[in-house]
Amino acid sequence: MARRALTTTAAMLTATAALLLTACGGGDSPSDDIKGADSGSSSPSASASASPAAPVVKRPVIKLPSSFQLTFENWTSSDPVEQAVLNDGKEQLRAGYAAIIENDPDSKARAFYDTEAGFSQSQQWIKSYTDKNLTVFGKLPVYDPKVSLAKNKAAAALSYCTDESKGYTRNRKTGEVKGNPAGTDPEVFYLISMAKNAQGVWQAVSARSERGGCS
């Protein structure tokens, strides 16, 4: 399951900072402050008012075969916004591998969790398997998730690691099985730029990876 590294760790950290600065506007705009924090107001009517309940979004049902075990370790946060990022980031990755296994680069489930630009990148990744008649099987742990939220909490950077040491590809036509080449680091670091859409779904805008970047 070896994949080409796309960038370096230093570049990833720079990209994360740039993402969050852009989302915050790079300044201290009053619109980003907590409402009422310096107004001195404690009006019951103000505190009682609540924004309308967010509409329930029907998310796609994503199924993976038992032959491919994609597990997520410590995928929880006490912060509800961070947890929402983790939840949708998890489903985005599951949808990608489901698309590979189903030989479907145009996966609607993956498109649901991607922006238009993000889905274009996802399709290239999926086709790097499907164009070669490859599917995946085995075990792929996903671990060490970290979420960095923009000040306005409408953009985020999600990073995590995967361990491909027990993940394999199989050629659909010949049955040939391949794992990581000898001497290849099985751990891959990922950095996903995410944005919340109008329906409240956290979508991937872009993704970068570095093999061996988890140590």
Each PLM stretch: what is its role?
Residues G25-D28:
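Bacterial signal peptide processing site
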Residues I34-P60:
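Post-signal peptide N-terminal segment of mature Sec-exported envelope proteins
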Residues S31:
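Cys/His-rich zinc-coordinating "finger/knuckle" motifs
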Residues P105-S215:
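Structured, amphipathic secondary-structure segments that form assembly/contact surfaces
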Residues I62-T135:
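Core segments of small alpha/beta cavity-forming domains
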Residues L20-A23:
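C-terminal motif of bacterial Sec signal peptides marking the signal peptidase cleavage site
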Residues M1-L13:
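Bacterial N-terminal signal peptides that target proteins for export
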